[in-house]
A protein has these predicted regions:
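A short, basic N-terminal segment
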Residues: 1-58, 83
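Walker A/P-loop nucleotide-binding motif
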Residues: 55-80
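Short, hydrophobic-biased segments on the C-terminal half of alpha helices
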Residues: 78, 174, 359-363
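C-terminal helical "lid" subdomain and adjoining coupling/linker elements of P-loop NTPases
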Residues: 167, 239-244, 252-313, 327-333, ...
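Conserved catalytic segments around the Walker B and adjacent sensor/switch elements
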Residues: 59-61, 84-102
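Terminal-proximal interaction/regulatory segments of ATP-powered molecular machines
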Residues: 324-414
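Post-Walker A helix-loop "phosphate-sensing" segment adjacent to the P-loop in P-loop NTPases
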Residues: 79-91, 119-122
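Mid-core helix/loop region of P-loop NTP-binding domains shared across ATPases and GTPases
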Residues: 2-17, 57, 92, 102-112, ...
Length: 414
């Protein structure tokens, strides 16, 4: 007797598979060769090289827009460094990768570091996800690290999100990490901060900046030719040969990603989604039509993810723009946006931010592509921002409705 999904699953068993290794198109994949990033690799390698002699390297800040290769270069250089240490019979550095957008509190950062070096509680159990004083979990980590002459390199990916979420707490987390070396006896910690925001430094406490930003490495966006080269390299690894025989597919993906400030991550995501669309439909080849459709899917998913991961204060500001747009306002100005935001903040029992801080959050929402702003001069009355939603009201409304707290407020405001 045929079962409900037999025919669907049979499609995946028949014919030539589209993918050979789809993981080659994911952000965490580290290829054997990294094209177009020799300068940055050499720079980071030269800074980290002293670890092979048992000397702690300087802290590094890597800057560049999303998809410019910052994270993959850091992973690649550390991977080669560890391999070289093992080949040479010297102690390899310990490494940890912390995604600061996900691991956003001091406790969770320290807990992940404990996990990475297998630092445990006095009774041998794992450090719990919650419940310990931060000082205690810090002591557990430092005691384990200092049990030998260790050098640990901690990569803080999207480090700017720590400070954007909460300036004071973010600076405290970074300061706590940078001052560890003053308390350790046998070991040392070095940090690699990775930021998508070139203005990130302006938000740092001077005492953090002076220590964290000892060395800076800039990653410029990839151009169209470089994106095409990266795509071709990954196509050869990820797809079976007949799957992408139309060169126009790679050219189109590269051109679309070049419009997105040379975002290689976006290009690889677009290529993977195109392949998955072809696979689900039982098509043997990836076409430009698949690419166009994949682009629409990714844009929709990107907006959803961007809104869902916003801090609550930023959601409140976005909601105020949405509420005014929903009332039929085409051009929304900072002052009226602030008035509605104040109502929302009060209803959510949030601290009401100053108008200047709300203006900063409006700029951040503009940078994320959720709203469009234009600065307008009002003569002797100064300047203001004209604001419009950059995405459909319906889509924003559906996402905001999924937030339980905001959906309750919406009933009173809309």
């Amino acid at each position: 007797m045929e079962k409900p999904l037999d025919k669907l699953f049979d499609k995946f068993l028949q014919g030539q598979a589209i993918f050979r290794d789809r993981n080659a198109l994911r952000p965490t994949y580290v290829p054997d060769e990294l094209p177009y990033r020799d300068e940055q690799m050499n720079r980071i390698g030269a800074i980290l090289g002293p670890t092979l002699r048992g000397a702690p390297p300087s802290n590094i800040l890597c800057y560049g827009k999303t998809g410019t290769g910052k994270t993959v270069v850091a992973r690649y250089v550390l991977q080669l460094l560890i391999e070289k240490a093992k080949q040479s019979g010297v102690v390899a550095p310990l490494t940890a990768f912390v995604n600061c957008r996900i691991v956003g509190t001091n406790y969770r950062v320290l807990r992940q570091l404990c996990e990475d070096i297998d630092a445990r509680m006095p009774d041998g159990s794992e450090v719990p996800f919650t419940g310990l004083p931060t000082d205690e979990i810090r002591s557990i980590f430092m005691r384990k690290l200092d049990s030998g002459p260790n050098i640990m390199v901690v990569v803080l990916d999207e480090v700017d999100s720590l400070v954007k979420r909460d300036v004071s707490q973010g600076n405290d987390i970074l300061y706590g990490l940078t001052r560890m070396n003053g308390e350790l006896i046998n070991s040392r910690v070095s940090l690699i901060g990775i930021s998508n925001d070139l203005k990130f430094k302006e938000m740092l406490d001077p005492r953090v900046l002076s220590t964290l930003g000892e060395e800076e490495v800039i990653f410029a966006p990839y151009n169209a030719v470089e994106l095409k080269g990266i795509l071709q390299q990954r196509v050869d690894i990820a797809f079976n040969k007949p799957a992408i025989s139309d060169e126009g597919v790679i050219n189109l993906v590269g051109a679309l990603a070049a419009q997105e400030h040379g975002d290689a991550r976006r290009a690889l995501d677009l290529l993977r989604t195109s392949g998955e669309l072809a696979e689900r439909r039982g098509d043997e080849k990836v076409t430009q039509g698949h690419v166009r459709e994949a682009q629409k899917i990714i844009e929709r998913d990107t907006i959803t993810e961007a809104v869902k991961t916003l801090p609550l204060q930023s959601k409140a500001v976005l909601f105020s723009v949405y509420a005014l747009a929903n009332r039929g306002k085409k051009d929304i100005f900072t002052g009226e946006c602030y008035n509605v935001y104040s109502e929302i903040a009060k209803a959510l029992s949030l601290d009401t931010l100053t108008q200047r801080r709300v203006s900063d959050l409006i700029s951040e929402l503009d940078m994320l592509g959720l709203i469009n702003t234009t600065v307008i001069s009002k003569g002797r009355y100064g300047r203001t921002k004209k604001i419009r939603l950059a995405v459909g009201k319906k889509q924003i409304g559906i996402i905001l409705d999924e937030d339980v707290r905001l959906s309750k407020v919406a009933k009173d405001l809309l």
